[in-house]
Amino acid sequence: MPVTDSIADYITRIRNAGRAKNKTTDIPYSKLRENISQLLQDKGYIKNFTVITTEKFPFIRIELKYTASGEPSIKEITRVSRPGRRTYEGKDIKKYLGGLGLYILSSSKGVITDKEAREQGVGGEILFRIY
C-alpha cells in the first residue's frame, strides 16, 4: 500500500520505535527524510542515522537516543502541515513551548528549525513539532 504522507510515516515510525524501546528503526529513503534525520541528529534527538543501499531500495536506519532512565529523548513528535491542510508561517514564527521544543520547517533555505528561520528571516511550511 503506497504511503500518501511520507513525513507522517517517518514521524510515526520514530514514535512507535521509541515507545517499543527499539534501538533502531528503518525508514524508506528520500532526500527530505535524510535532511530531517541530519537535523534531528544535530539537535540531539536521535543518536545517529545511516543511509543503507540494498538491491531493492535504499533506506535510512535511525539509532534512537534514550535518557539514563531509559525514556526516549523524543517526548512528543507531531505532524503539523498535512497534505489536506498545509500550514505555512512567515518569518515571525512563534517559539514552540517557549523555546523548549522545535518546529521543523521546509523553507527556501532547506530543512531548518524555527530558531534558524527567525535568525535568517525566512518562513516556510511547518512540517512537524518535536519536544
From Swiss-Prot:
Q: Does the keyword rRNA-binding apply?
A: yes
Its subunit composition reads: Part of the 30S ribosomal subunit. Contacts proteins S5 and S12.
The residues that cross the membrane are none
What is the protein name for this chain? Answer: Small ribosomal subunit protein uS8
**PANTHER family the UniProt entry points to:** 40S RIBOSOMAL PROTEIN S15A
InterPro entries found in the cross-reference section: Ribosomal_uS8 (IPR000630), Ribosomal_uS8_CS (IPR047863), Ribosomal_uS8_sf (IPR035987)
Alphabetized Gene3D superfamilies for the sequence: 3.30.1370.30, 3.30.1490.10
Q: Which NCBIfam families match?
A: PRK00136.1
Mind naming one GO cellular-component term on file for this protein? ribonucleoprotein complex
> Domain of life here?
Bacteria
GO MF terms here are: rRNA binding; structural constituent of ribosome
A family per Pfam: Ribosomal_S8
